[in-house]
């Protein structure tokens, strides 16, 4: 099926099959479609609403075309990632949580990019922290195998995305591609916490990952609108485990934490996010630093559970709390900076 036929179907509010979606996505991602066609396709898909079959097809093509990171083992390797677009401009919770995971001995293959609508994307934060981003897949694998954490800069691993960049930018709206990033980890992780910008996406994306072979995933959206677990409101979870999907709400109190306002956790820049994270991961904390630490503990705990590194969400949160207060997570961030600096010298020689 070519994109013109697909557009005719979509205008008629008809879904594409998984295979038809694969064909159209392959045309888009290999430069066979005009920008007008891509923009029309993305807008039509949004107005129709993307089906699970269509998302599965799109994800499978992006994974196929990605520059992959080959790890010695995927057992227990986790990613904690969000779609973004929640409008809250909270500091980089998932990226900070990744260093707590690594300090706990849980390997992390972190996938991320620069900010699109927010103030600080994961790549922006890590760059502000002095971490070199332009790594080869082999170098990323060495980071994960040696330190227990590595960062995969999305634009380096999904170069085929450049064909859709113009239409996406000019549309200025959330499209299918906003959902695809968290589902296309170049290391092929089977354990994830995926934050989404709308509760209605939780179950569908859990079903997509179920069909694509994921093992243990939490797809989450908080009642106060965050694409992660919130301290200020209940969080809705669609959990994929043992091939089954269950849905439930989680209150901070269910996990031994206290509900509190998120006031003071919004940031205006990557540097501000880094300063708050340094405060949160350090031994002495300001009031906002303590609150940020609890937000990190909540989300890192969920990822420890998704990685099967903890037996329950509550046990994961307890472990994350203990690890964060050792100061080892901040040390892990500094280790990654030093480790990648060597690769920078190699790559720029």
Swiss-Prot record:
Question: Which GO CC annotations does the UniProt entry carry?
Answer: cytosol
Residues binding Mg(2+) 2, per UniProt: 227-228
Q: Which UniProt keywords apply?
A: Amino-acid biosynthesis, Aromatic amino acid biosynthesis, Glycosyltransferase, Magnesium, Metal-binding, Transferase, Tryptophan biosynthesis
Give the reaction(s) catalysed.
Answer: N-(5-phospho-beta-D-ribosyl)anthranilate + diphosphate = 5-phospho-alpha-D-ribose 1-diphosphate + anthranilate
* Broadest EC class assigned to this enzyme: transferase
Q: How is the cofactor bound?
A: Binds 2 magnesium ions per monomer.
Coiled-coil stretches, from where to where? none
Give the residues the record marks as binding Mg(2+) 1: 94, 228
Family classification: Belongs to the anthranilate phosphoribosyltransferase family.
What is the annotated role of this protein in its UniProt record?
Catalyzes the transfer of the phosphoribosyl group of 5-phosphorylribose-1-pyrophosphate (PRPP) to anthranilate to yield N-(5'-phosphoribosyl)-anthranilate (PRA).
- Official protein name in the record: Anthranilate phosphoribosyltransferase
């Amino acid at each position: 099926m070519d994109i013109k036929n697909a557009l005719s179907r979509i205008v008629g509010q008809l879904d594409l099959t998984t295979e038809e979606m694969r064909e159209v996505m392959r045309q888009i991602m290999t430069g066979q479609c005009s920008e007008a066609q891509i923009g029309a396709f993305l807008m039509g898909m949004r107005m129709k609403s993307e089906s699970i079959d269509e998302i599965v097809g799109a994800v499978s093509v992006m994974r196929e075309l990605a520059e992959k990171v080959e790890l010695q083992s995927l057992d227990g390797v986790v990613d904690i990632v969000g779609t973004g677009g929640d409008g809250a401009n909270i500091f980089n919770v998932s990226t900070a949580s990744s260093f707590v995971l690594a300090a706990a001995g849980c390997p992390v293959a972190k996938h991320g990019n620069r900010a699109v609508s927010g103030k600080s994307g994961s790549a922006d934060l890590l760059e502000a922290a002095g971490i070199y981003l332009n790594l080869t897949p082999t170098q990323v694998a060495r980071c994960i195998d040696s330190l227990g954490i590595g960062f995969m800069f999305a634009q380096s691993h999904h170069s085929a995305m450049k064909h859709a960049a113009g239409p996406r930018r000019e549309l200025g709206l959330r499209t299918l591609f906003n959902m695809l990033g968290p589902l296309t980890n170049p290391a092929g992780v089977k354990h994830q916490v995926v934050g989404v910008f709308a509760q209605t996406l939780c179950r569908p994306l859990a079903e997509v990952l179920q069909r694509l072979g994921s093992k243990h995933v939490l797809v989450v959206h908080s009642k106060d609108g965050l694409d992660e677990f919130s301290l200020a409101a209940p969080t809705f979870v669609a959990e994929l485990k043992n091939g089954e999907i269950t849905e439930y709400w989680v209150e901070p109190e269910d996990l031994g934490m206290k509900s509190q306002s998120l006031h003071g956790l919004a940031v205006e820049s990557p540097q501000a996010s880094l300063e708050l994270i340094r405060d949160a991961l350090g031994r002495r904390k300001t009031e906002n630093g303590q609150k940020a630490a609890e937000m990190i503990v909540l989300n890192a705990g969920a990822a420890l559970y998704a990685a099967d590194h903890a037996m329950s969400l509550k046990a994961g949160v307890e472990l994350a709390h203990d690890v964060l207060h050792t100061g080892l997570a901040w040390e892990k961030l500094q280790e990654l900076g030093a480790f990648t600096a060597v690769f920078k010298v190699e790559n720029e020689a």
